[in-house]
């Protein structure tokens, strides 16, 4: 019998559908709540060769994926795909390279460069997003130079290196 591991933090509707479809095909599912595991290469006993990474948390999912890859388990999506998808700027670069239509975008690291990038994109409005993160957190629609300066000043004061990377995207 085939066994597939499902790496998760929460079983949502999609995971329930995957589990149901696997049962119909006589595929054994091993549910692995990554929050409850000890990932140690010397002691971990793995009884599946393929895993689906379905964690809500990018950090937990990435670490679990890299662990299972290190012990020879094929993980879908693998860590290379995850590293592209977890960063909006990198994702946009890959999509553009593959000729997938995307809104114009730029990555800058200071207000002066942000102004130049926005001018090159055709002006306001734009959206500023953190390169890392999900669920629409910390994004801002910027309608003019005053809003741009205010948002970038706030990001600068927050102090986190992630807040000092400005992923700017054309508003569509």
Labelled PLM ranges:
Residues 55, 130, 170:
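Short secondary-structure boundary segments
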Residues 39-40, 113-117, 147:
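Short acidic active-site motifs
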Residues 1, 125, 165:
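A residue-level signal for beta-strand positions that form part of recognition/binding surfaces
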Residues 140-172:
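Phosphate-binding site of ATP-dependent enzymes
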Residues 27-32, 68-138:
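A conserved helix-loop-beta module that forms one wall/lid of the active-site cleft
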Residues 5-6, 51-53, 77, 103-105, ...:
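Short catalytic-loop micro-motif centered on adjacent basic/acidic residues
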Residues 1-81, 90:
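ATP-binding N-terminal substructure of ATP-dependent carboxylate-amine bond-forming enzymes
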Residues 44, 119-120, 131-133, 159-161, ...:
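Solvent-exposed alpha-helices and their adjacent loops that cap or buttress functional pockets
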């Amino acid at each position: 019998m085939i066994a597939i591991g499902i790496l998760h933090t929460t079983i949502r509707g999609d995971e329930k559908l995957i589990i149901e479809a696997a049962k119909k095909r006589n595929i054994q599912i091993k549910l692995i709540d990554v929050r409850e595991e000890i990932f140690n290469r010397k002691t971990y006993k793995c009884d599946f060769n393929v895993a689906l990474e379905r964690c809500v948390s990018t950090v937990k999912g990435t670490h679990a994926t890299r662990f299972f890859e290190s012990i020879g388990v094929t993980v879908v999506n693998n860590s290379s795909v995850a590293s592209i998808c977890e960063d909006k700027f990198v994702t946009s670069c890959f999509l553009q390279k593959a000729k997938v239509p995307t809104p114009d975008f730029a990555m800058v690291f200071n207000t002066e460069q942000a102004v130049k990038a926005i001018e090159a994109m055709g002006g306001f409005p734009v959206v500023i997003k953190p390169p890392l993160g999900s669920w629409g957190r910390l994004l801002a629609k910027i309608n003019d130079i005053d809003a741009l300066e205010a948002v970038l000043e706030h990001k600068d004061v927050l102090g986190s290196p992630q807040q000092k990377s400005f992923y700017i995207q054309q508003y569509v």
